[in-house]
Amino acid sequence: MLYRKWGSEKDEVVNYTSSVDSDREIIEEVKLTMKAHVISLYLTGYLGKETARKILVALNEFKEIGQGYEDIHEALEDFLIKKVGEDAGWIGLGRSRNDHVATALRLRLRNKLIELLTDINSLRKILLDKAKEHITTIFPSYTHLQLAQPTTFAHYLTYIEEELASRWEIIFSTLKQVNKSPLGSGAIVGTNVKIDREKEAELLGFDSIIYNTLSATSSRADILSTISELTVLMVVLSRIAEDLIFFSSNKLIKLPDSHVSTSSLMPQKRNPVTMEILRAKAAESIGMLTSLLSIYKGLPTGYNLDLQEMNKYYWLVINYTKSSIGVLSSLFSQIQVNKINIDESSLATDDAELLSISKKVPYRSTYFEIAKKVREGSYKSTLKIEDSINMKAVIGSPNFDLMANLIKIRETKLKEDEKEIEEYKLKIISKLGELQVIENEIGE
């Protein structure tokens, strides 16, 4: 028997409480966590070099979780005992599933977030490159889904890029919160074994440790903050998807062929299927975040098995977010803008403003004067669409020159963000390299 008991595929209790399916997501991270623990026991003198070597060799051979186990931790320990023998039981010294799963979750989420942040930057670059092509491409803007004022497609694209940049900064800050080590905290109050928690954290590439062992083993608040921000990002992406569906339906843009499908009956149809799926995945993400918060809200402090039911939702939300960023990268790299004739009523605001300035009368007076002409059907503007855009005098407007300068500013910010995430990633890799060096030394 190990922990509670060995189960079987027919054991209803084991099957009911088992987390094996969701644990497959963290196999490599659980192994890495165990390596750090074994090395820590070796460095502090609790484990002999030969025993440590055998365990580390066996760890590298573990590939899959069999059936009949409560979780990956039970499966891994059973595997090690069968491979190494009784000496593998030393891994239980100073270790709990509680601190090990908390560590593995953070390692996995860290890797996923670094990948996602890199992907977001790739999409931002695509948007800025495309914006440079469309600085003078006339495009309508809308409020209440009604025609508002003339803008450019570059103006729309840089709006998306800045939204993504804002989300990027917040998600990067959650990454820093996630990248703290719970390892060495035991089940709840630590352990009598003199484990160097800070050394373990360093070997695993963490920035620091979570000091309080109760918090380290039972808190999921940092992860929930991350999933919350990813869900906000998905909501932002869903709005963009809705825009693209609307623009496509109104013949303002042509979506890439790879992002549309036709009807089984109507051969002329170009259905925006990828954007429809993105909207649905955003809704699912909201539902999964709600499930996570609902599970977590009533738990007493300390580890409870309810926490394992949260794990599957972490990976679903982050995988949905990553795939959605990838789909939008593909779409925007190929999107085409159609030639658009914008109704001249969209120039009414410009005429009212110019009239107020030239006559030196309150804007509300000229507003009503222009509005009356629009209602009567007698409104005619003397402006061209391009004039309307280039008269805009504020930073962030679609004015051609100001937009060209804004794109340069945004490109500089993107390069800074690219450098920041790359340096952060390399710092982690460097620390993990030290763990590998020690493992190699033990294996000699």
Curated annotation (Swiss-Prot):
Major enzyme class: lyase
Pathway this chain belongs to: Amino-acid biosynthesis; L-arginine biosynthesis; L-arginine from L-ornithine and carbamoyl phosphate: step 3/3
Any single biological process term in GO: L-arginine biosynthetic process
InterPro entries linked: Argininosuccinate_lyase, Fumarase/histidase_N, Fumarate_lyase_fam, Fumarate_lyase_N, L-Aspartase-like
An example Gene Ontology molecular-function term: argininosuccinate lyase activity
Keyword Cytoplasm annotated: yes
EC number: 4.3.2.1
Protein name: Argininosuccinate lyase
A Pfam short name: Lyase_1
Compartments (UniProt record): Cytoplasm
Keywords, alphabetical: Amino-acid biosynthesis, Arginine biosynthesis, Cytoplasm, Lyase
GO cellular component assignments: cytosol
Coarse class of the protein's main subcellular location: cytoplasm
Family to which this protein belongs: Belongs to the lyase 1 family. Argininosuccinate lyase subfamily.
Catalytic activities: 2-(N(omega)-L-arginino)succinate = fumarate + L-arginine
Organism field: Saccharolobus solfataricus (strain ATCC 35092 / DSM 1617 / JCM 11322 / P2)
